[in-house]
Amino acid sequence: MSGDSDGRLNPVPDPERMEVFIEAMTPPGPAHLQGLEQEALLAGVPIIRPQTQNLIRFFLTMNRPARILEIGTAVGFSALFMQHYAPEGCRILTIEKDHERAAAARGNFIKYDRGTAAGGKKTGIELMEGDAAQVLQEIREDASFDLVFMDAAKGQYIRFLPDAVRLLSPGGILITDNILQEGEILSSRFAVTRRNRTIHARMRAYIRALMEEPRLETLLLPTGDGAAVSLKKK
């Protein structure tokens, strides 16, 4: 319950109703990507939720990054989404471990990139296939990124964090998706099923590491399935 100025208690709005309202008030995403979004949902491939799309779009518009790093490509929807809203000339490097998804993403970068279809231009997206923990270590520090989007295996976030911070430009933004794990992160580890306890513990460790990292200023948001927005201090 919350109170108003005259001391009366007001009921807390239902989270699901709030989510439906916000999504209803939000303009639709890029029309040329709606087909890919539906294909992914029907195939059970996880892609960024509408509220997370709004969050990313906001920071792309505000920060106008020249270089973006994505950890976790899946079938390429989020990379194409970011390309649509990023400034002209922005370069996106995206990393995917799963070979089948990486192959699907490469096909989608050709199929859904309007520049490529129209004039044979480069997509501005480079995909590196492999374990992100290893790939990140191979990227030189002088190849810094203005925005890093982390949306890969949730139990591995803690492994990716040191290199994600290292490669983030001062003043750059790190967006981490799915930190609430469908609300399970709120529960005690003893209330979580045994098979989910490891990822539960690792996600809590990741969130603590974000909040305690002296180079970052981090805000935790209930957006979508939870998102952390971290600013690298200058």
Where do the language-model regions lie?
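A short, structure-level motif marking secondary-structure boundaries and short turns
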Residues: V20-I22, A40-L42, K121, A191-T193
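S-adenosylmethionine/decaboxylated-SAM
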Residues: P50-K234
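Generic secondary-structure boundary/loop-capping signal
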Residues: E19, G44-V45, T176
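Short N-terminal amphipathic alpha-helix/helix-capping patch enriched in small hydrophobics
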Residues: M18, H32, T52-L55
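N-terminal auxiliary segments of SAM/dcSAM-dependent transferases
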Residues: M1-P30
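Conserved SAM-binding loop and adjacent beta-strand
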Residues: T26-P28, L41-N54, T61
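A generic structural signal for short
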Residues: G7, A24-M25, G44-V45, A152, ...
